[in-house]
Amino acid sequence: MLFRSWTFYRFKNFDTYYYLGGQELAQYTGRVAENEIADIEQLFDYKINGRFQFIIYNKLTDFEQSNIGLGTDELNTNTGGLTKLVGNKVLVYFDGDFRHFKEQLRAGIAQVLINQLLYGGSVKERVQSAALINFPDWYIKGLITFVAKGWPLEDDNQLRILLHEKGPKHFNALCEINSTLAGQSLWNFVVNRYGPSTISNLIYMSRVNKNIEGGFVYVIGSSLKELNKNWKEYYTPIYQNDDTLFTNTNEKPALKFKKKTQNITQLKLSPDGNSIAFIENNSGKYKCFIYDFSKNKKRKMFKGGYKHEASYLDEANPLIAWHPSGKYLTSIYEKKGHYKMDYFELGKNIKRTSSKFYYFDKVLDFSYSSNGNDIVLSGVQKGQSDLFIFNPRTKFTRQLTNDRWDDNHPKFVMNDQYILFQSTRFTDSLKTTSFKQKEDLFTSNTTDLFLYDCLNFSPKLIQLTNTPLVNETNPLMIDNAHFLYLSDVSGIKNRQLATLDSTIAFIDTSIHYKYIFSSESVSNYSSDIQLQDVNFNKTKTAFINFYNRRFNLFTITPQAILSSRISQLNKTTRRKSIDRDAIPKERQNDVNTILDVTNQDNPVKLADTIKHASNSFITDFPKSNNSEKGNTSISIPTPKDSIISVVSDSTFYQMPKQRNYDVTFA
């Protein structure tokens, strides 16, 4: 395999190991890891012993094949589970989303630090300490997750759904359902109630007392029983108030999924809207079905994968899309480390044609042009996700974007002249970027919508949304003037309807148009819309929503959407908190504005930080370099809630010398 030949960069406090195709990811890790290590050390008031070794995989399937740590006792004492970890080796992979990649880095750093704090630095110390101290999963995994990504909206909504109506009545019951989310929510409660410095104090006193009960009693004066009660009293009124602001789905479900925890990762309406294809993914083992609305029957098309208990799920494998003719369904999937493209010709007997698809490390999404001759896709090459046009007949691929911003969910629109897509970019100019320039590391932590003129291959994009705190995802076009997309502007992922209009800006040798984009809410559901799609004929849309304690499939016509505008936009408590605290007062009106896309302001730079005082306990842990400065700034990240990630103060960054690593990790 390609990843047997390793190369690495040696930085001051860590090394980044990579193989063919992963150099750019190693450079990115080198730019951001130093700040993340210092930030997490400051949070825990502890200096990590030893050097980090970040082992970087280009994709999830390579990551799953790793044999690092096999045959040692270290995996048996790995108290985490969110990131593969052996000693100070942190294993991460790239799935096309730099936000998730950075979360993995933070989770791995936090995991190493927590292991050292609780169990000591060496394997011998960990084994001895593990026999004396038993920390539950919610404590360790919840803390690692909270340090990695804070308390984002999707986790807040997941907890609200679990606690809704007939959900778990107490904290321990929630732990049986989802111990990581339970612990993450408890640490969020502790930080909000007692401050971020409480984290390091609790860990230290838990280690001293050899149990977590003693730590909580000594630091916050509450037993675990009292703490769990306070946790419930903290979240219950918040979610009860939120529930009064939103409504359940009133439509009758077109299809009810049998399993309450069913993961539907793909949803594609047939061109005529009479049937729908979807992927059921059960912990890595997937099945593709086509459901006929009129016959109320579903037909299995194919299956694959294998079931595993890992915490990661590849939602982009497999991918499916209908050919505009409706005669066959196309699937792009990964098997044994290689991509394939299969065509399923529909009829009484399904005819399957398979071809190899060599071009990408990973494919994130794809869709057909209206004539079926071309495919637009989001593909990963050399550690970045870009847009490409692929011709299935000639096998010719043309790259449209080539930069460090994450581009996904592309669709041909407006008679195939434009491509509608979502991206983390904050500029409307296309250019080639690298991680050596400081400006190329500015990345929006939320996604906006863009239009690309693929007829003229314009270097200038049309930016449709500019919402620094809001994620716009899954864009669709339901007629010539209206877009439909999902937005968490209310704190819950609901439908937004957007209208694109144009006026003449000026005339010289040709007419130049100025585009105006406005949006409004057209759904007010109390739970996230997971996926949505519209058929080629624009007669039906479909979406998946949580209803009656399970996920269900609903359909609605575009005409009904156009007439279902919401007069007042309600927001969850968590969304209000983000809007209030995360941006300067002078920019608070930017959260949901009508955007003139020809005259945009650049997003402001913002660090999502929490101020706190020095720890009140004197510990025997080594102090971090910044711990003697009195009042300091600690970052409890909510990556998708902050505006811009900035990782370096230098304009140009000189990478260290590349070194070959000849001995395979084992």
Task: Locate predicted features.
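Juxtacatalytic substrate-recognition/specificity segment
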Residues: 1-129, 136, 153-154, 215
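Beta/coil-rich, acidic/histidine-enriched accessory regions frequently appended to metallopeptidases
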Residues: 6-10, 204, 208-311, 315-320, ...
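Active-site-proximal alpha-helical
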Residues: 16, 40, 135-155, 160-221
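A flexible loop/linker signature enriched in serine peptidases of the S9 family
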Residues: 157, 260-261, 279-289, 306-314, ...
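A short beta-strand motif characteristic of beta-propeller blades
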Residues: 252-258, 297-311, 350-357, 396-401, ...
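Blade-terminus and WD-like Trp-Asp/Gly-His loop motifs, strongest in beta-propeller folds
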Residues: 267-275, 319-328, 366-374, 410-418, ...
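Short coil turn/linker residues within repeat-based beta-strand modules
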Residues: 295-297, 336, 347-350, 393-396, ...
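Outer-membrane beta-barrel initiation region
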Residues: 606-666
